[in-house]
């Protein structure tokens, strides 16, 4: 399973946090992937909107994963 799903659909960049069992806590690897996508989209004039969402019902994001 991928911890963060990054995709582009037209002018929308989408980042989905995908660690519902860990309340979508961010790992260092996830942060690096998100940063890479944001830098890429900043340089892409086609991307006008960045949408961040999360899988799971309990939490959007509980913050940084302290066990990582």
Task: Give residue ranges: language-model regions.
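Short, flexible, mixed-charge acidic loops at enzyme active sites
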Residues: 63-68
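Conserved CoA-thioester-binding segment of acyl-CoA-metabolizing enzymes
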Residues: 1-60
């Amino acid at each position: 399973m991928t911890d963060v799903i990054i995709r582009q659909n037209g002018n929308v960049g989408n980042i989905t946090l995908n660690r519902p069992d860990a309340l979508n806590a961010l790992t260092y690897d996830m942060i690096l992937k998100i940063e890479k996508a944001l830098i890429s989209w900043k340089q892409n004039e086609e991307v006008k909107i960045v949408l961040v969402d999360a899988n799971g019902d309990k939490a959007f994001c509980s913050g940084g994963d302290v066990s990582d």
